């Protein structure tokens, strides 16, 4: 079930403070965060946010089409290594 509209979007306080201070200063440094649950708001447009995926921080450049989505959607946590090749020699026996 989606979040109620009367509550508004959830963004961690520490993250929105970092974005606001960079907007006031006019800088666009990479912001490192572990908050995958935070929603992307219009104030974040043009910023690069490094989102933690459990192992490393993946840089995500925020564009207009990302507004309304969560940061965690853009840093995958699982790596797909491919399916095992069908080995006919071992099956034949």
UniProtKB/Swiss-Prot annotation:
InterPro entries: Ribosomal_uS19, Ribosomal_uS19_bac-type, Ribosomal_uS19_CS, Ribosomal_uS19_SF. GO terms for cellular component: cytoplasm; small ribosomal subunit. Pfam families: Ribosomal_S19. The keyword Ribonucleoprotein applies. Protein S19 forms a complex with S13 that binds strongly to the 16S ribosomal RNA. GO terms for biological process: ribosomal small subunit assembly; translation. It comes from Streptomyces coelicolor (strain ATCC BAA-471 / A3(2) / M145). Belongs to the universal ribosomal protein uS19 family. This is Small ribosomal subunit protein uS19. PROSITE patterns: RIBOSOMAL_S19. Keywords: Ribonucleoprotein, Ribosomal protein, RNA-binding, rRNA-binding. Residues 83-93 have a biased composition (Basic and acidic residues). Residues 73-93 are annotated as: Disordered. The gene is rpsS. Gene3D superfamilies: 30s Ribosomal Protein S19, Chain A. One of its GO terms (molecular function) is rRNA binding.
